[in-house]
Amino acid sequence: MKPIHHALVSARLFGGAVEDYVPLHNAFDMSKAALGDMRHRSALHSVDHGRMVMALIFPERIGNASRDELCIQHVHDDQGFGATLDSWLSECTVPTFARIRRKPPASLEGFLEEPAVAAAARWGGEPEDFAAICDYYALPGRVSDHPLAPAMSLNAFGIFFSEMAFGPALTITTRSGRQKYVPVRDIGECLAIARFGRLLSLKDVVETMACKDWMTGSRVARSRRRRCATAGRADLFSQEMDGQDAASSLVVTESELSCILRD
């Protein structure tokens, strides 16, 4: 599904304008610019890691829906179930760059243990100035113990994507009282090189991922049939533009909505 089609489903589920929902669904699918096959979805198509990343970018309410509801919808639309980061990573063998820890350059050693402190020492300002962006790179490790988890944000796509949340640069006040810009990608690149010795591409990270049928949509058709039946709407996934104003009669209780979102 393309972002506009996810947004049509959102409008049918929640009401409101299709355009309200396009930005979030587009953000989920941006990883395809970095990798042209379905493995790109491992970057964000998860109800744990992907949802946490979107919380850094979008408000809690979008249109008539909660951000979390839309994230869950998107993952189920594409995968047919609530895929987690481990759903993807469990299909990977661990490549050499994730098995062998190399000693980083001396100038980057601090980024392994206390990245916010190391960033402040490198660019000025205080550690708290860098805490939020360092937390972004730690998100995969909060939901997965897989050796590849840190690389799911510390790759070229994840580093570029950080600008969605933090903009192109942080504004830092140095100890001398002067202000300076620190490009947010510089922070991610230092973290990545300290950890892996080089800047990985998203393809590097998922190169060993086995292609499973669920990744290419084997569970989607059954999920959609169930969701349409639960919603009482055969047109829930139609690509036609009608039926967007009927959402008010669709959702009665939160538990019913949960069934429709999650199959």
For every predicted segment, state its role:
Residues 1-263:
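N-terminal membrane-targeting hydrophobic helices
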